[in-house]
């Protein structure tokens, strides 16, 4: 397709056929590597078993009686890079463990017209409207400052719809300039070298311990969808839209499989580099930022429980008996 050897109509027919597989199409027709390498830091094949979730979520679904919340994490891109938002549903069990489910991945700023930080802020605020998250994590190093500056302002979209400003709960540089009455749901993350090492280590630990669940593969989702009357009656556009979160999850897995441990002078630091330098890592960055903040929230939850109940934070009061 790159050299004009494949007809575009033929390619589109392939992609809409019942037997279409994103992975096989990428390998056979686009010469794109998929899968893992012996150098990969993450075990691609092992992680596949955590792809259990059949349906993505497009808005908040708060289940009665459950202790859950949503969290959105954003890795900011500009010009040639993508801005990626990962949407997590976090369920807290009786022991205080925070189990994460990646229910959607949104790529913002797909075209040149939507790459402005004003438009990206509107897109993030639409996600806030839909998912009512407890927090929105933004990497405020470098380019992220541009998005952060817009998030504390109000905007109107092309239809005249109003989007309210939000405020940072943890970044002192914004305290004096952000609206005093704006909801403080923004969390600024300044990912420098030492912190990045911890973020990578946390992502590895939570993934290998099975504390994260993902959407099933797009081919499985497509087969399930096409077995229903609703799926069969869907337009091609609606079908692609429905399956897109599954494809984005596969791309996240491919990005993780493309990361290897970089040799550094400091053996205690975890520094990851791309095996194929042309392959992006923005989805992984957004994903890892979210997992890091979930870990911090879990630790804060455990500390509060220990202060309240004593003991190990499992919600059971520790009693002392005297004789």
What residue spans do the PLM features occupy?
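ATPase catalytic-site recognition across NTP-hydrolyzing enzymes
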Residues: 1-74
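Gly/Ser/Thr-rich loops at beta-strand to alpha-helix junctions
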Residues: 78-79, 142-145
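Repeat-solenoid scaffold signature
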Residues: 133-137, 144-154, 183-188
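ASCE P-loop NTPase helicase motor core
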Residues: 1-14, 145-171
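Short acidic, Gly/Ser-rich segments with clustered Asp/Glu that frequently serve as metal-coordination loops
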Residues: 73-82
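Nucleic-acid-processing active sites and adjacent nucleic-acid-binding tracks
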Residues: 61, 81, 87-138
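C-terminal nuclease/phosphodiesterase catalytic domains that cleave nucleic-acid phosphodiester bonds
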Residues: 28, 32, 36, 40, ...
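A structural signal for short, well-ordered beta-strand segments and their strand-loop junctions
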Residues: 137-139, 214-215
């Amino acid at each position: 397709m790159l050299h004009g050897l494949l007809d575009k109509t033929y390619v589109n027919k392939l992609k809409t056929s019942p037997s279409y597989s994103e992975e096989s199409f990428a390998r056979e027709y686009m010469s794109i590597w998929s899968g893992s390498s012996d150098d990969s830091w993450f075990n691609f094949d092992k992680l596949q078993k955590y792809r259990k979730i059949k349906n993505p979520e497009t808005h908040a679904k708060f289940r009665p009686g459950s202790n859950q919340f949503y969290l959105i994490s954003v890795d900011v891109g500009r010009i040639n890079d993508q801005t990626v938002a990962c949407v997590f549903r976090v369920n807290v069990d009786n022991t205080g463990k925070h189990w994460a489910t990646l229910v959607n991945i949104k790529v913002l700023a797909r075209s040149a017209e939507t790459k402005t930080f004003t438009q990206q802020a509107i897109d993030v605020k639409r996600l806030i409207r839909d998912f009512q998250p407890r927090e929105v994590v933004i990497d405020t190093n470098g380019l992220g400052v541009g998005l952060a500056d817009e998030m504390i302002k109000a905007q109107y979209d092309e239809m005249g719809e109003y989007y309210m400003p939000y405020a940072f709960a943890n970044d002192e540089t914004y305290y004096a300039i952000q609206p005093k009455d704006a909801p403080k749901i923004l969390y600024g993350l300044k990912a420098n070298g030492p912190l990045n090492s911890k973020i990578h280590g946390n992502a590895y630990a939570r993934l290998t311990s099975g504390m994260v669940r993902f959407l099933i593969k797009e081919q499985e989702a497509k087969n399930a969808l096409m077995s229903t009357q609703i799926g069969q009656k869907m337009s091609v556009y609606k079908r692609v839209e429905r399956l897109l979160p599954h494809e984005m999850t596969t791309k996240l897995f491919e990005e993780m499989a493309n990361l290897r441990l970089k040799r550094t002078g400091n053996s205690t630091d975890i520094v990851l580099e791309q095996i194929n330098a042309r392959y992006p890592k923005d989805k992984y960055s957004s994903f890892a930022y979210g997992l890091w903040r979930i870990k911090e929230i879990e630790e804060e939850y455990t500390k509060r429980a220990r202060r309240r109940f004593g003991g190990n934070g499992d919600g059971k009061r520790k009693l002392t008996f005297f004789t």
